[in-house]
Amino acid sequence: MATKKKKKHQFPTAYTVIIIVLLLVQLLTFVIPAGNYATIAYDTSNKDFVVTRPSGKKYKEPATQATLKKHKVNIAVKKFKDGTIYKPVAIPNSYERINLKKSNLWQAINQFFTSQVQGIAQSVDIIAFVLILGGCIGVVHANGAINSGMQALSKKIKGKQVLLIILVMGLISLGGTTFGLAEETMAMYPILIPVFLLAGYDTMTVLGTIFLGTSIGTMISTINPFSTIIASNTAGVNFARALPLRITMWVICTVVGMIYVIRYAEKVRKDPTKSVVYDQYEEDREKYLNDADFNKPANFTWQQKLSLIIFGIAFIVMIWGVQQKGWYFTEISVVFLTAGYLMAIFSGLSEHKVVQAFVDGASDLLGVALTIGLARAVSIVMDDSHTSDTIMHFFSQQISGMSPLIFIWFLFIVYIILGFFIQSSSGLAVLSMPIMAPLANVVGIDRASVIDAYNWGLGFISLVAPTGLILMSLMMVNIDFNKWFKWCWKLLVIEFVLCLVALGVGLLVY
């Protein structure tokens, strides 16, 4: 009698993971009381402050330093007026529970589905970017530019594979620490995956190089305006004072990350069976290398060369625009859409083939686009239930009165927890800094340490939080979350210990 083959257990997909998190958050809203901090924001139209009470009632006050002092908001008024602080800032000691009727079963079910649709609607700028990017990549693939490029590159990278990891990871980490390069790296996966596979590596190496690069960079932010700068301004401290420690920490963590990736990558290059994703080895090579023979000499047409040049220029313009002009996804999408039109014109393909290639490319990234929208639903449920401020208030009550070292370590863990629910760096900064920064004065430490705990805690949880960038990145390389965690958990322990040590050092040097 034939024995039945045991069915292999499969880890849930990214969609299911997000839905599970969404359900858990929704269940928490039945337990966690609703509450708000009062907030203060600058009205650019009327040139005055608008104070919003926890009840939602609003009133105006003069846009002066005296108004901020009255509310114990330790921020220079010019930071509001020049647009540096553009979000409502929480007012310390203003938390109040609000009388918000808890949802019944039907309302909860309705919110569960509605929040997902709202999440997709609110993420339309990022979704448009992802789909347009996919379309552009489809056109580049269709005219053979990528395969020809890989053939030309195959001989040049031979024996220099490690430099590829160092260069890519170093530049991405630099972008993360200086101007918050994060979601924009989605554009790099389709281009770098074939390059890394050609070098003998696997898709986990690509994920480690790109995602760890941006995660470490944004975690150890030095002059990132979306985290360190806005947190420093909200806390009322000069960010430049803490730069030596933060730069040192960034270099150490980036080098540690590089060593971790390189050791694994070289092991895989020498023996592909050592790959964490070896079960999809053939599938990945067939999908990304298209069975091309890279031993043949490259047959590069001028149309293919021009397509790659246009695509490369689009990347350069994107990075310049984000860093120098403060562009967001609408402007970036326009850049790649323009590049798509130009590549279509010079691709050498017929109109029908160009359109089909664009649609096929966009459809390949549709799953990533939907994941982005679903992840936003978690934040929507938190906002609608008014539980974020309650969680913040609870932790602020727990950490007051501790010794300096225990305080800053515990605060780091608090930000890891808060970062799971609030992935927006600027949003978490303006919500938490007015509450947490004054506690540093009570304990007797510099507020710069609080900013480090915020940055490093949020960045640390971003490495594994389903509400962050990781699930979208995993979908780009077709890797399950459990494989990612199995691969990176040792690095997580190392980075966690490094953060604790650096926070302790910060107490001595600030």
What are these regions (language model features)?
Residues Q118, S148-K158, P194-L198, K353-D364, ...:
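Short amphipathic alpha-helical coupling elements at transmembrane boundaries
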Residues A2-V17, Y189-D279, A298-T301, K305, ...:
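Membrane-core helix-loop-helix motifs of multi-pass transport proteins
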Residues A2-Y15, N36-G56, P244-A357, V477-K483, ...:
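Long, contiguous bundles of hydrophobic transmembrane helices that form the permeation core
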Residues V130, Q161-G176, Y201-I216, V251, ...:
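Alpha-helical transmembrane segments of multi-pass membrane proteins
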Residues Q122-I126, I137-N147, G176-A187, G217-N224, ...:
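Short helix-coil transition sites and intra-membrane helix breaks within transmembrane domains
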Residues Y15-V31, V130-G138, L171-G175, G217, ...:
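Hydrophobic core segments of alpha-helical transmembrane domains in multi-pass membrane transport
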Residues A14-L23, V51-N147, W327-T390:
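Core transmembrane alpha-helical segments of multi-pass membrane transporters/permeases
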Residues L131, K160-I191, I372-M382, Q398-P438:
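Hydrophobic alpha-helical transmembrane segments of multi-pass integral membrane proteins
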